[in-house]
């Protein structure tokens, strides 16, 4: 019973934490590939113009 009560009291904090982590992860998931693609296409276009 005591363990159940403790688990119940920690659950809202857990949900909040997972929500924050999920939001942060989603932000990274969107931003990181965008930056990677931008730098990649930039270096690719540079190497292409350098080659031709």
UniProtKB/Swiss-Prot annotation:
It comes from the Bacteria. Induction: Expressed approximately equally in exponential and stationary phases (at protein level). InterPro entries: YoaL-like. It holds the Pfam family YoaL. May serve a regulatory role in expression of downstream gene yoaE; in a yoaL-yoaE-lacZ fusion mutation of the start codon to a stop codon in yoaL decreases expression of beta-galactosidase, suggesting translation of the 2 genes is coupled. This gene lies upstream of and overlaps yoaE on the same strand in another reading frame. This is Protein YoaL.
